[in-house]
């Protein structure tokens, strides 16, 4: 079988990070305008993964409500993949119920737009909660992708070469304490290993020789993952031409503008039976210089205290009596509102 290069277009989108929310919001509108234009103009631009969130569409349509019909069309056609989360979260800085409601809200909102991407997506979480496989399986999701927490993580987030791999491959089984098990995919070459693919032949040859070798080093099957994007990365508008160039240069490789659903399906059909089993929390601190969780738990304690108080009020004070005789929509807005904060 020929090796298949699955190129998945995406952009990792923090609503707030090095800029305040509204500045990122303006950038997101520009980003989405360009993405939708590309998808309308180029039928060979097969799909785009919207970072495992649905809130990006809410933010975009707040400014561009006239684009709602087009957005829903692309979601239903499985060209624009959204969810299953409402918003990407740091799993350790919120209560456990928040993680459940984030997934519940995201799947409900994605279904409202027309389709749910059933891949547990944790691209840049600073470690992952041990019960994630159990929670995902309960939601009908049996595959997850993540970038951190499996040891050892090398410099620039690449897996280090030594004999102490927790997982020999970028694919593994991830198991919760209750025994729930899903297929896990580690971004061993990070989630930007397929960004800015050159369309010019000479540059493309050098690019793909390096990228293919990097992916083959860790892949357990002939299906190689290339993430075409990075943090707040604009869509690559000439990707279709770039993949045509790659196909001409490397006839022994099948280049596919893919999506996580197809990629995970291929993995499940062909993965090795002796994959490593990673159990519980993914919180490895073993690195060659970068600590995956440093300085995240103790920053801005007052905000964490306020968030914890809100969650406690929802779960222990407001919802129990509401469940007895409350109007359904009264508290439905609470968790999405808290998630935005």
What are these regions (language model features)?
Residues 1-341:
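Catalytic-domain carbohydrate-binding cleft regions of carbohydrate-active enzymes
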């Amino acid at each position: 079988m020929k090796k298949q290069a699955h190129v998945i277009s995406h952009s990792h989108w923090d609503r707030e990070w090095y800029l305040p929310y509204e500045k990122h919001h303006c950038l997101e509108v520009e980003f989405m305008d360009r993405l939708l234009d590309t998808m309308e103009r180029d039928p060979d631009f097969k799909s785009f993964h919207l970072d495992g969130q649905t809130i990006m569409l809410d933010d975009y349509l707040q400014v561009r409500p006239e684009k709602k019909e087009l957005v829903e069309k692309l979601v239903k056609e499985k060209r624009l993949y959204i969810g299953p989360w409402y918003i990407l979260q740091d799993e350790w800085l919120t209560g456990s119920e928040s993680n459940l409601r984030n997934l519940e809200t995201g799947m409900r909102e994605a279904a409202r737009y027309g389709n749910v991407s059933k891949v547990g997506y944790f691209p840049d979480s600073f470690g992952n909660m041990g019960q994630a496989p159990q929670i995902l399986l309960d939601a009908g999701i049996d595959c997850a992708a993540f970038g951190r927490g499996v040891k050892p993580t090398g410099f620039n987030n690449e897996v280090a070469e030594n004999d102490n791999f927790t997982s020999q491959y970028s694919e593994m089984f991830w198991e919760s304490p209750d025994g729930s098990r899903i297929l896990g995919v580690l971004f061993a070459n990070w989630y930007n290993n397929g960004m800015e693919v050159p369309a010019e032949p000479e540059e493309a040859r050098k690019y793909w020789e390096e990228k293919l070798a990097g992916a083959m080093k860790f892949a357990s099957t002939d299906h190689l993952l290339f993430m075409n994007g990075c943090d707040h990365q604009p869509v690559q508008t000439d990707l279709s031409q770039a993949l045509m160039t790659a196909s001409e240069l490397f006839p022994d490789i099948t280049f596919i503008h893919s999506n996580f659903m197809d990629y995970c399906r291929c993995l499940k059909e062909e993965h090795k039976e002796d994959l490593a089993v990673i159990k519980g929390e993914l919180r490895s601190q073993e690195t060659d210089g970068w600590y995956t969780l440093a300085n995240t738990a103790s920053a801005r304690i007052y905000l964490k205290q306020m968030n914890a108080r809100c969650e406690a009020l929802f779960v222990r004070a407001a919802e129990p009596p509401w469940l007895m005789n409350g109007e359904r929509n009264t508290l439905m807005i609470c968790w999405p509102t808290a998630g935005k904060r």
